[in-house]
A protein has these predicted regions:
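ABC family nucleotide-binding domain
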Residues: 12-227, 231
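ABC-family P-loop ATPase nucleotide-binding domain
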Residues: 1-23, 233-246
Length: 246
């Protein structure tokens, strides 16, 4: 078994970005997705990153989740400069320290939901018996233990999102990144999913919700607003250099 990294003490910055930029080459022109972002997120904090389409919020999520790298600037995760990590080390972080929940669920359609939840542990080399035990426990946390043998097509949208959350939780990550987690759900189901994230935050997970919906952002303790690749001043949270409250 590969142990999950120990969480940092509550209140300590687990995520720290300094002057982070991201530029994409678009043929004859360059697209500046992020422009000098400074951001601290404390261990155990619950935040929302909001902004319209094209604002840079998804790019920021990809960098925070180690799915992409900055063009310039520095990103430290739990005190370690991410730029110094090898591809293998980055893959280990994505598998063990960060849990991802996507709007589209990203479930394998021909695999049972138990098998879907097992996947991160398969990549980590966990044995079959332990994988199944932990996957069933994760499904139990989201109220779907009895659905373990079912296929994703046999579940509602809300249930599929719960499976995605169980998969994100199965390696006991300290950070949960959710990209528009209620975007495909009806209002009542969306409330239930957000209540689940509220519970996970209360348990000490660092929860980051990426959304354009202020009703979703209202569940976070702090709101970061992104406009044109920059953290914006104005109503909606602790903007400016986006450091956590003292």
């Amino acid at each position: 078994m590969t142990a999950a990294a120990a969480p940092m003490p509550a209140g300590m910055p687990v995520i720290s970005l300094r002057e982070v930029t991201k530029v994409y080459d678009s043929g004859d022109s360059a697209v500046h997705a992020l422009r000098g972002v400074d951001l601290d997120i404390a261990s155990g904090e619950s935040i929302a990153i909001i902004g319209p389409s094209g604002s840079g919020k998804s790019t920021l999520m990809h960098i925070v989740g180690c799915l992409d790298v900055p063009s310039s600037g520095e990103y430290e995760l739990a005190g370690t400069p991410v730029s110094r990590l090898s591809n293998r080390e980055l893959a280990r972080i994505r598998n063990q320290r960060i849990g991802f929940v996507f709007q589209a669920y990203n479930l394998l359609p021909r695999a049972s939901i138990l098998r879907n939840v097992e996947l991160p542990m398969m990549y980590a080399g966990v044995g079959r018996a332990e994988r199944q035990t932990r996957a069933r426990a994760a499904l139990g946390k989201v109220g779907l233990a009895e659905r373990a043998p079912h296929l994703p097509s046999q579940l509602s949208g809300g249930q599929r999102q719960r499976v995605a959350i169980a998969r994100a939780l199965v390696n006991n990550p300290s950070i949960l990144l959710a990209d528009e987690p209620t975007g495909n759900l009806d209002t009542q189901t969306g409330r239930e999913i957000l209540a689940l994230f509220d519970d996970l935050g209360a348990q000490g997970h660092t929860v980051i919700l990426v959304t354009h919906d202020m009703s979703v952002a209202a569940h976070a303790k702090r709101v970061i607003r992104i406009v044109d690749g920059r953290i914006a001043d104005g109503p909606g949270g602790d903007e400016g250099d986006a450091r956590p409250p003292a």
